[in-house]
Amino acid sequence: MIVEEIMKTKVETLKADDTIETAIKLMREKKIKHIPITNDALEVIGIVSDRDVKDGTPSIFHDDSSTSELQNPLKLIMKKDVITGHPLDFVEEVAALFYEHRISCLPILKEKKLVGIITETDLLYTLIQLTGAHQPGSQIEVKVPHKAGILYEVAGIIRRNNSNIQSVLVYPDKKDENFKILVFRVRTMNPMNVIDDLKKEGYDVLWPNMPGISS
């Protein structure tokens, strides 16, 4: 999946000379937390978050204070080193940017112009859709040797039980580099037969692992 499939293309922007008060009103009206700051050519020159606004106007939270700070221009508080993405970037690459740089939104540029934006909420919804977690079904986690063809073998056992696989995730076993964990989302509310067959074939089923499920 690529970025242009999940990005929002209607992006609220402001100029560097707009006031902090304008940003606050826009955030409240549109229920957003980030505003890209652009020039007349729609090139991103900064970004302002709700945290930047709070840090830039601490006195407005005191009853006896002046609200003159609200008239300060956004260029005084905006972040200028903006990390950006491209519409053809893979979603997992963008997720890595969020993780590595601890950001919560990413302006998307094409030919240096702003064409969209992605937030951490967008990534969360995408993860839910990719894993099928929003659909009825069951999750099965299996510890398997790290070798070629193992995914095909385990999927074959699930297939023999006429259970449709909604999604598959694969990640390393943190305790043993010779193993990996397969996480299946299957379209059945009762995975007992699948689990029993997996265990009969010698696979280590990590989840479900509860009373009533044979070992």
Feature annotation, model-predicted:
Residues 179-188:
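Short basic, glycine-rich beta-strand/loop surfaces that mediate nucleic-acid
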Residues 172-179, 209-215:
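Short proline/glycine- and acidic-rich turn/helix-capping motifs at secondary-structure junctions
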Residues 193, 199-215:
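Short, charged, intrinsically disordered terminal tails
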Residues 1-10, 49-86, 90-99, 113-114, ...:
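Tandem CBS (Bateman) regulatory domains
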Residues 27, 35-51, 98, 106-121:
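A glycine-centered beta-loop-beta connector
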Residues 1-49, 56-59:
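Basic, Lys/Arg-rich alpha-helical nucleic-acid-recognition elements, primarily the DNA-binding modules
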